[in-house]
Each structure stands twice: as structure tokens, then as C-alpha cells.
Amino acid sequence: MMFTLHRAGPADVADIMLLETSTFGSDAWSPAMMLADVAQPHCYYLVATSERSSELRGYAGLLSPQGAPDADIQTIAVAPDARRHGLGRQLMLALLSEAELRGARRVFLEVRADNPAAQHLYDTLGFTSIGTRRGYYQPDNVDAIVMRLDLAHGAAQKAEAGSDD
């Protein structure tokens, strides 16, 4: 399965929210929160469509102010039928490349402790666990594992070359 990525804008938020609510349920962002983040100049959001249709198959967002040393993966979601086809990796690599272009030296993220598939993806990209935020995801009271990737020049390309997907 092949996917096309493009920069998300306000017009994409309705489709993003369909996947957001079906993926994250009680943890889902509100439409207003998503719209504010997508429209924010320090954020970079991508949407992915299947090459066979224009239907949204995934999205991901990065907070990375130009020149700031730290960036944060805000969110990532992949539709169930598009999982295990490399789309999560493709989205993450694109965000890591953008973080590098904006001058970030470190990228952080939080991942649910009960999501081993996402944890594995982040491990293969070179992220390491640096701590736990107890009860971070509410109302489910699920812990968040905090992860960090120290970027070196070309880190995204190196991660892509080392892909096991």
C-alpha cells in the first residue's frame, strides 16, 4: 500500500477528527484544539491519503518552533486498515526531517504504556524511554512513557536506512 503525504491545513481538520475520535476515544482532542494546533505556525501537521483514494489514512503533528532545540511529536494516528504498511514510520520520518530543518536537536513524545506497537516503532527510530508520567491519559488513567530522540545531522535518513518494516 502506498501513501501520499501533504501538509495539513484547517480544511483537513474535519477528516482528521474522524480518525482522531475513532483512534483515541476518550483521549481524543477536541475539534477546537486540533484546529488551533494545525493552524499554529510553530506546528507542522501532515495528512496521509492512499494513492488509490483521497480518503485520510493517517495524520501526525509536530510542535517545533524555528531555532528551538527541542521539538515534540504532538500526535500520530493511522487508520486500522493502513497499519502494518509503514505509514506510521513514513509520517514519523517526515516529522523528524521537519524538526531537523527547523533546528531541533531533540525530539520528545509521550506514548501510552498500553500501546506496544507504537513503542516498538519509536524504538526502531532510535527513541529511548526517559521517564513515566503516571495517569497521564485521562479519563482512562493510563501511564505515558516519555521518550526522546537526540537528533544528529541526517537522523531521519539514518532511521529510514535502518528500517525493519
Task: Identify the residue ranges that each predicted region occupies.
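Acetyl-CoA-dependent GNAT
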Residues: 3, 7-81, 92-94, 98-102, ...
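Conserved catalytic-core motifs of GNAT/GCN5-like acyltransferases
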Residues: 32, 110, 123, 128-145
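Conserved catalytic core of the tyrosine transesterase superfamily
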Residues: 43, 106-112, 138, 143-152, ...
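Active-site acidic-Proline motif in GNAT/NAT acetyltransferases
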Residues: 79-81, 85, 113-115
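Short glycine/proline-centered loop/turn elements that form peptide/ligand docking sites
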Residues: 92, 114-118, 135-140
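Conserved GNAT acetyl-CoA-binding A-motif
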Residues: 99-110, 133
